[in-house]
Structures are given as structure tokens and as C-alpha cells.
A protein has these predicted regions:
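N-terminal secretory signal peptides
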Residues: 1-8, 22, 26
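N-terminal export leaders
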Residues: 9-17
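Structural helix-boundary/capping segments
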Residues: 13, 39-54, 58, 183, ...
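C-terminal motif of bacterial Sec signal peptides marking the signal peptidase cleavage site
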Residues: 30-31
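Gly/Ser-rich catalytic/binding loops embedded in alpha/beta enzyme cores
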Residues: 34-35, 39-181, 363-364
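Glycine-rich, small-residue loops and helix-cap segments
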Residues: 46-47, 91, 349-454
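Short helix-loop capping/hinge segments that flank enzyme active sites or metal/cofactor-binding pockets
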Residues: 85-108, 307-354, 417-424
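Gly/Ser-rich, acidic/histidine-flanked active-site/gating loops
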Residues: 88, 94, 242-312, 324, ...
């Protein structure tokens, strides 16, 4: 593989992200503040040098809020396929041979061994020609949605410099938005790809649960965990998704569904953006949009049940270690773990029963259609707030009422970027029936052609 191909292929695919990349290179430091620097390591030149064939390198990152470790590449491609030349930021929750899983915790690195094998999803990307350029930061254990990490810093949100990046796929999403990676591989347990994609103006995809292997992924809540990914443009998202997803027969959706009741969970400014996009949908050649009269009275209970199940499982998996290291955790994950340890076995059993019934209701409601709704309840909150405080938590509760619809049934979902009237990123989410992942990809391509994203 010629070294120059590494960037030529990326430039060809990242069509829609070109203007964003230019804006980032022109003014990222001024907009988002000085990145954290190690005084012993000289700053890197702008951009990364071309890859030296399949040789690997490793260096201490200057932007420690985004990266735990970087390389050029850190892990070279093992094959030459449709992702040749693309750069992957792997969230530091995945096993990468020769590296530790830091999980956003500096203290954890002192206690865990070096991995001897690479996670299945990472290996698949490497096999298809992509190279890993670094392990990206995350909220501690992936148990947070703000992206704030007290040990390493908060990754930049290049599209909204005064706002949070969102988590838990915070570092990988920021790397993609900054243009230092083409693919951000993360985890979407209860919205950890949908939220940063919405906040940073990125495309995101979370597959049907079980469609992509979680082997080598540090679990948080096995009931909900799934690999997921973000990209700056639709062409790259489609290429990555087609690589990772299993082959299935494809067919069109019967219709598209939307609900004023569900949409109204979003705040007014975001709701206007959603309505404008749906108006454009109605006049396009996309699947017919049907408005449904939906009772949303159960959404708070469903969302709370998701949080309780996630918390119960997270504490059973990590509580013994976390109990010894609680003061080292960032505010949001620390509060989440403190609350998780109080969830009784009987509560978990009761909430799992509730979610089983909810899943039947959601699956019946969506049927053979695709549900269109806001990805989050608002654009990204300002960076000045406390992510463990009540205001942020109320925002996340509202977002949880939206994200739970796909989470509960393990449904495939895609996040596409829109903008509010004042130019702040905000995402639209499309949720498809279980197993219809590739049909959702086809609809995404049609969505771009129909002008709904303009």
C-alpha cells in the first residue's frame, strides 16, 4: 500500500465533512481552548505524517483529553479492503493487543494487564484496511453521557466550542469532529454514541443488539451493550457499517412513523429543527411519513427501568474495584455508581419484567416501519455546568425517554446531523425494526439524496 493512499481514500470518502475539517483546522484552538500538553513531549506538527507502510509507532498524545495513546498508526491494517486508508479512533473500552484497557481511569491502568488479543470489532476494521491511530478517552467505565473526565480533561466539541462533547464515546467522537480520525468506534449502551453524535454534528450508527460482536469489549451493562460508531460524513458511515454488519436480504420500509408526543420531549429550539426536517421528508420520495397519536405516559418509567438495569449490572461487574477507587472517578460516573450500589435484586427483577413488556409494545408500534424522532432532548449543554448536578441530570432524563425506545428492544438506529437556527448541532434519530440494519443504511443514503439534511 502506498503511504499517500492513507489520506487519499479518506479525503475521497469524507465529502460532507470537508467544510467542518477546514473550520477546525482554521480555529480549533481559539474556539475550544489550549489542549493539554505534556511538557516533556514536543508538540506534533499540524496533521499526521503519511504512514510508513504497515510499520507502527506509538507516542504520548498532546491532546490528552481526547487520546490516551496515539500512533501513526498505533495498529497497522491487517488487510486491504473497503476501508483502506481510513483512521480509527478506538474508545478505550476495547481490547487492543499490546495495550491496556484504561476505561477512562488513570488509576485502573495500575491494576490491569496488557491485552493479548484484539477485540472482534476492532479486528474486523483492521482486516478491512483501516488503521488504528489511537485509543480515545471516555467517561469512567463508559458510565456517563457528559464526556467530562476529571483526570484527563474534557474533549473538545469543535462544532460548538462552549458546549460538552457528550459521552461516553467522547474522545473518539471529538477526534472525528476534529479531523484526526475518520471512524470513531465506541459503545452505545444507553445512548453513548447517539448523544455525542447529536452534540457534535456527526453521523452515528448503533446496530441491532448482537449483530456486531462484543468480544473484547469491557462490559458495562450486558443487557444493553453494543458496539457503535461515528463518522463525519455519510459515505464513511455507510462504508464502515457495510463492513461490520452481517449480510441480510434488503427491502424497503413500509412507512416512516413520527409522533408529536414523543417529539415534544425535546426542547422548543430542537423541536423546530425536527419539524423542519419532517416537513422536508413529507414532500420527498422517502417512505410515506405517518403521524401517530402516541401515549408517552410510560416513557419515564421505561427510561428509569433502563437506568436501573444498567446500574445494577454495572455495579455487579465493577463495584468491587470501584468501591476502592471511588474518589478517583469523575463526578457523573461516581454519582452513577453510588446510586447503582443501592439497587436491590428484587428491583432488578421487577425492572427486567417491565422492560420485557415494554419491548413488546415498542416492537409492535414500529412494526415494519422506521421511527423518526429527536436523537437527544436538546443540543449539547454548556461546558460550565456540573454533569453530576440536577440540571444536567434532568436533561439526561429527558434524553433517556427518547433513547430508551431503541435501547429496550435492541433496535438498529442511526443519528444524522441537523442544526438549530443559531447553528448549534443537533441530531435526528431513525430507529428501524430488529435485524433491518442494512435497510436502515439504504434509507440513510436516500435521506441524503432527498435533501432532508440540507
Amino acid at each position: 500500500m502506498a503511504p499517500s493512499r492513507y489520506f487519499d481514500r479518506r479525503g475521497f470518502l469524507r465529502v460532507a465533512g470537508a467544510s467542518a475539517a477546514a473550520a477546525v483546522s482554521a480555529g480549533l484552538i481559539g474556539a475550544c481552548g489550549e489542549p493539554l500538553r505534556d511538557p516533556e513531549v514536543p508538540p506534533l506538527p499540524d496533521g499526521l505524517p503519511p504512514l510508513d507502510g504497515r510499520a507502527t509507532s506509538e507516542f504520548v498524545p498532546t491532546d490528552k483529553a481526547t487520546w490516551r495513546v496515539q500512533g501513526n498508526p498505533l495498529v497497522a491494517p491487517t488487510g486491504d479492503g473497503p476501508l483502506a486508508g481510513l483512521r480509527v479512533a478506538v474508545t478505550d473500552l476495547y481490547a487492543v493487543e499490546g495495550q491496556q484497557i484504561g476505561a477512562g481511569s488513570g488509576r485502573r491502568l495500575a491494576d490491569v494487564p496488557v491485552e493479548t488479543a484484539t477485540a472482534a470489532a476492532v479486528a474486523r476494521l483492521l482486516d478491512s484496511g483501516a488503521g488504528v491511530v489511537g485509543l480515545a478517552q471516555t467517561d469512567d467505565f463508559g458510565y456517563g453521557h457528559s464526556g467530562v473526565n476529571l483526570q484527563f480533561g474534557t474533549p473538545a466539541n469543535p462544532e460548538a466550542g462552549d458546549r460538552l462533547p457528550g459521552g461516553a464515546t467522547s474522545g473518539a467522537a471529538s477526534a472525528v469532529a476534529q479531523g484526526t480520525a475518520d471512524i470513531g468506534l465506541g459503545i452505545d449502551t444507553t445512548g453513548s454514541v447517539r448523544i455525542p453524535a447529536s452534540y457534535q454534528g456527526l453521523f452515528g450508527f448503533a446496530p441491532s443488539r448482537g449483530a456486531v460482536s462484543t468480544e473484547g469489549l469491557l462490559p458495562l451493562s450486558p443487557t444493553f451493550d453494543t458496539p457503535a460508531w461515528v463518522c463525519a460524513d455519510l459515505a464513511t458511515l455507510v462504508a464502515v457499517s457495510e463492513t461490520l454488519l452481517p449480510l441480510r436480504d434488503e427491502r424497503e420500509f413500509a412507512a416512516a412513523l413520527s409522533s408529536d408526543g414523543i417529539n415534544a420531549v425535546a426542547e422548543a429550539g430542537a423541536l423546530r429543527v425536527v419539524r423542519d426536517a419532517l416537513s422536508a421528508w413529507e414532500t420527498s420520495s422517502l417512505p410515506r411519513l405517518t403521524w401517530t397519536d402516541t401515549d408517552i405516559g410510560q416513557l419515564p418509567d421505561w427510561s428509569e427501568a433502563v437506568a436501573d438495569v444498567q446500574g445494577y449490572e454495572a455495579w455487579r461487574l465493577h463495584g468491587e474495584w470501584v468501591a476502592q477507587a471511588l474518589p478517583s472517578l469523575s463526578n457523573e460516573p461516581r454519582r452513577n455508581f453510588v446510586e447503582a450500589q443501592r439497587i436491590w435484586d428484587s428491583t432488578y427483577t421487577r425492572k427486567m419484567t417491565l422492560l420485557a413488556e415494554a419491548s413488546k409494545t415498542i416492537t409492535t408500534y414500529i412494526g415494519d416501519s422506521v421511527l423518526v424522532l429527536p436523537a437527544t432532548s436538546s443540543p449539547a449543554p454548556k461546558r460550565t455546568g456540573d454533569p453530576s448536578g440536577d440540571r444536567f441530570r434532568n436533561t439526561m432524563r429527558a434524553t433517556g425517554m427518547l433513547t430508551c425506545l431503541a435501547t429496550i428492544s435492541g433496535l438498529p438506529n442511526a443519528t444524522v446531523p441537523l442544526r438549530t437556527g443559531d447553528g448549534v448541532p443537533f441530531g435526528l434519530c431513525l430507529v428501524g425494526p430488529f435485524g433491518r440494519d442494512r435497510d436502515l443504511l439504504t434509507l440513510l443514503k436516500d435521506l441524503g439524496d432527498a435533501g432532508v439534511l440540507d
